[in-house]
Structures are given as structure tokens and as C-alpha cells.
Amino acid sequence: MDYLWIMIGSALGGAARFWVTGFVAEQTGGIFPWGTVLINVSGSFLIGFFGSLTGAEGRFVVGESARLFVMIGLCGGFTTFSSFSLQTLNLMRQGEMIRAGGNIALSVVFCLLAVWLGHVVAVAINQMKGA
């Protein structure tokens, strides 16, 4: 049954990624892969937040299937290291070394910050009294 939850989460995450990247490309002109940056940063926040909120010391108890659905399925289908890599390679092949370097720097720094921030927010919620 876990595989089914992972597959459903992956399908939803992939569909959301397709929509968000297309929407962002329309808004920004597609000169820089802002959609992929947004996807990976927000997905990093979500996995850090949900993982810490529902982990062993988390405030919310959810079943392992729910964690698999969100963390492996949804986040796995939503975020995309392969698209980031291909877009960076294409920028490099086009001679856009500054943009390629910017994509690498933005993605790595902001994704690490986002996963940390998601964890910090979840820890703060976990430590709240009541509720």
C-alpha cells in the first residue's frame, strides 16, 4: 500500500511542478529557470517542515504512509534535481556562465536555507504549549 501512496504523491507533485514551472516561465520570459528554483526551494522547505513536524519528536503524529506520501511522493515528484542540472548545462552550452553559476548558487544556497527554515518553523511549532 505504501507504493500506492508514493505513486499518488509523485503524480500530484509532478503535475504541480509542471504547472508552476510553466506559469513562472510565462511570467518571467523564461530567460532564467526561476520556476525550477522556486520548485526546489519550496519543496526543500516542505520536506524540512513536514519531516520535523511529524518526526519522532514532532508535534503531530501521522502514519508512515502519510510521511511517505508527502516526503517521498509529493516532494519527490515536485522537486527536480535533473531539471536543475539540465537547465544549468544548457546555460553553460549557450555561453551563459554567469547565469549558470547564478543558478547553481541560488539553488544550493536557497534550498539549504529553505530546508533549515522549514525545520526551524516545525521545531518552534513542536515546542508550543497546548494545542
Curated annotation (Swiss-Prot):
Superkingdom of this protein's organism: Bacteria
Residue positions binding Na(+): G76, T79
Keyword terms of this UniProt record: Cell inner membrane, Cell membrane, Ion channel, Ion transport, Membrane, Metal-binding, Sodium, Transmembrane, Transmembrane helix, Transport
Membrane-crossing residue ranges in chain numbering: 4-24, 30-50, 68-88, 104-124
Keyword Cell membrane in record: yes
GO biological process terms held by the UniProt record: cellular detoxification of fluoride
Cross-referenced NCBIfam families: crcB (TIGR00494), PRK14206.1 (NF010802)
The protein's name: Fluoride-specific ion channel FluC
Source organism per UniProt: Methylocella silvestris (strain DSM 15510 / CIP 108128 / LMG 27833 / NCIMB 13906 / BL2)
Name of the gene: fluC
